[in-house]
Amino acid sequence: MSKQFTLGALAFGAVFGLAAPAAAAGIAVIPGYASLGEVSTTAYHQPSRSPFGMETEPATGDVSSKWHAVEAEIEQEEAVLVNCRSEQACPAAALELLDIVAEGADRAGRARIGLINRAVNLAIIPTSDEAQWGVADHWSPPFETLQTHRGDCEDYAIVKYVALLEAGLSRDDLKIVILRNFAPNQDHAVLAVRLDGEWLILGNNTLALVRDKDMIGAKPIFVLDQDGAHRLIASNRVAASDPLLHRTLQEN
């Protein structure tokens, strides 16, 4: 990238587009959030290992170090959840996370993902890191977010990542993606979930499960998963299907 990525720019309520207006599609949008506009349905790619059909390269710096720190805390919290399931002493935040997981326990596939996405979105009040922590950027592990019931976009994504793992989804099918919105010019974190060969994007500003190929108004920059932090780069397939997206990726 030619510009330094600034984590402090992550927006806690950024809006990304859908292939139809929320109201027309019968989608329930969380009260107080901006409505969603129409977008093109141009597909960027065929199903792939990475969201948006893009290639990746290892990322270093602040993004990588913050993700590794959160991963270490997630590992500790997963051990606590194991104890909770064996009826040992369980902190309130862990019980709340298990309650979120239970929202989708009796369902499968898209229904399970949607119910857990809804439960997380309704459990957390969108709050900037400046307002909550007095710093430009702070990434919280799930228990910390659920203790305060406040967080910004990456905090929602991290809770969803762990909740869906606990619900039985594979780590291979879960990736946190950092996007750069075109308007406003802000960075925004979402969770990408692979289902039946397609990637669904779960944001904190809507209850809709949006296919990656139905999104416009933002470009993907980083992907965070079990393999660490990686920067997304435009592939030849993306360049052929969407020259504008390819050009904007190369410019940043």
Regions found by a protein language model. Name each.
Residues 9-17:
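Bacterial N-terminal signal peptides
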Residues 2-8, 21-252:
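A structural boundary/capping signal
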